[in-house]
């Protein structure tokens, strides 16, 4: 995975004046000084975390430029747990992706003890040596947990890496840091936040969320869900977006957990885009240890499953949106909503095409209400059913963040007389929603269904080019 960028200090962020094309993000880990003031609002001041999970970070110095900040992270369950993961679809799958797949397949999603992550080096396209390095990381955590594996194929810890592609890990440094991290395992908010920092590369802030909830079978029992993620560039799904680890103390069987994660990811981490590039390393893992007790979720037909699906999907969307808000060089957070589609898949495909369009993204950066670019993207969307897009019944509008009336740009294929002053005011805001109505504004019109698809993306700025032109420096 290419994200060798960590918070502003694991590789310091150098902020340049606007005349110098904005901020250059060198590999750096976000710290209290380097985090932009505008991003501080996304960092939680407190949290409630799932029982039985302990986390920690430690400094290994994976990149020589990092002399003090944590770049190895551990998320461990005190007891064996169920686990599921969704991985990148990139053909050049990194060593940690391959090893984690093997661990899950060997154990059928059961008996997993945690995840080990390093930032600063992706361990991708590194041959057999890279695979051995990833296996050693997993085995080292098992050893620290007091459950040493009987061999490289019998480990119980998933592995993730993020950083520059094509370089071998400084594996001795990492193996030396793992026991240090393990000795510091804790469940406090500050420890969770520090661990979220340790997995960053060019991120400008740590991405961490937690929440409590109840389930129908146990209305008086409190459950917790926590998640951390990293990513700011090389973000485009299937499944390729970033690294993410979600933990819950709900008892869930491996098969039900896999179904829950697949549904949630399709509507969250697989519905975001920063630059349209699919990474080699990206992984989202979900761990459930059942430490809070109660009735186990074992089938997809129970009320608890339905409730958990809604809770997990909403949570994953919030976590994924933090990645977009930290997009490299981004100045805007855009939601594109395609409605009145015959199917969710078609609506999502159209929304994805709009989100990937460089012309749409640059127009939004320039605060230009150039809806023709949006229409163009709708028109060339691939893989959708015949008759889904009919120009004469297509409408496009901007939905302002302040809740005021939509600014209609196109109605039933006919352009509106756009109030350019109002359009300019709307585009000054950081947040914007683009609404594409495929049914001419009438739900179910002319046989269309009422399905909708959502996508979240950011704009393209001068800074994006600067950051990625200097990525390895």
Swiss-Prot record:
MF term (GO), any: L-glutamate N-acetyltransferase activity
Catalytic reactions on record: N(2)-acetyl-L-ornithine + L-glutamate = N-acetyl-L-glutamate + L-ornithine; L-glutamate + acetyl-CoA = N-acetyl-L-glutamate + CoA + H(+)
Family indicated by similarity: Belongs to the ArgJ family.
EC number assigned by the record: 2.3.1.35, 2.3.1.1
Localization terms from the record: Mitochondrion matrix
Site (Cleavage): 240-241
Residues the entry annotates as binding substrate: 201, 230, 241, 328, 468, 473
Annotated TM spans: none
Residues annotated as catalytic: 241
Alphabetical keyword list: Acyltransferase, Amino-acid biosynthesis, Arginine biosynthesis, Autocatalytic cleavage, Mitochondrion, Multifunctional enzyme, Transferase
Protein name: Arginine biosynthesis bifunctional protein ArgJ, mitochondrial
Subunit structure: Heterodimer of an alpha and a beta chain.
GO biological process: L-arginine biosynthetic process; ornithine biosynthetic process
Protein task: Catalyzes two activities which are involved in the cyclic version of arginine biosynthesis: the synthesis of acetylglutamate from glutamate and acetyl-CoA, and of ornithine by transacetylation between acetylornithine and glutamate.
Main localization category: mitochondrion
Residues with site note (Involved in the stabilization of negative charge on the oxyanion by the formation of the oxyanion hole): 162-163
A Pfam family of this chain: ArgJ
Leftover remarks: This protein may be expected to contain an N-terminal transit peptide but none has been predicted.
Domain of life (superkingdom): Eukaryota
